[in-house]
Amino acid sequence: MELRHLRYFVAVAEEGHITRAAERLGIQQPPLSQQIKAIESELGVQLFRRKARGVELTDAGKTFLEDARTTLSQLERAFEATRRTARGEQGRLCVGVTSTAPFHPLVPRAIRVFREACPMVSVTVEECLSNELIERLQGERMDVAFIRTSLSTRDGLVVNPLVKESMVVALPSVHVLAQGKRDAAIPFRRLANETFILYGPPGTGMYDATIAACQAAGFNPKVGNLGASTQQAPRIASTLSLVAAGLGVSCVPSSVQRMNMDGVVYRSLKGPAQPRALLSLASRRNDPSAVVRQFVNQFVNMVRKEAKGILSD
């Protein structure tokens, strides 16, 4: 028995008339009558009683109708689930973020819009440093990641630059530079004698951007592997905690100002050497997952539509 036989049987049962069922199915009446007889022959039972003006189900036919409808319904759900998966509208997606990425409004909005468009996709979000996110992507332990990196290419990955946002300096609230007007920008060179708390290890975008800005301003920041002036923090929360404790200052993306912490104030920077933090979306090159392609295409198209290219804040 084939799937079409179940559809033939259900159509005749619902119409109560072979001719009307044939019209509904788009086939001729004689072949449909033959198919119904073939089904009854295969089952070894009578499914319909012939009447003067149509047919009616026998008790055996009523039982078969219930199961036939269930089978067809289950198959239709399976077909639709398969189609959704092929379109990237069903499945799983693991999204990686650096601890600063969610502060930029694009990131939570991208995830929200995707979930609204593809509610059948199970989305999980994991937080790591950019270097760790890249390792997980390359190791196929993550699907996509919002990263802060100065590199536009990585082995086996596609890195889509999204946003270049200016960085601000986070200062202890008791710092002399924090006492001026809130909207007064600080010349970057005035940070030359400060102890810098760097976010992340060398090779991450914000670390490299801070070092480059200091050098462009004519000084080397007080950072290193030894000495009291050395401070590095793996997460933005720990970075700001060290700032609040008075252990130094830190350059952070301007969007991080949304994070209020007692003992920390933010000030914009001015001068020719202003650091900028690049936010990118990374994924594996030629990833076969339709869900990944759907997310990346949807997000990149959203950014391009809004900004005609890489965004600036």
How should each PLM-predicted stretch be described?
Residues 40-59:
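A short LG(V/I)-centered, amphipathic sequence patch enriched
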Residues 29-30, 80, 86-118, 122-126, ...:
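N-terminal winged-helix
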Residues 158-202, 276-286, 298-300, 304:
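Hydrophobic/proline-rich hinge and linker segments of small-molecule sensing/allosteric domains
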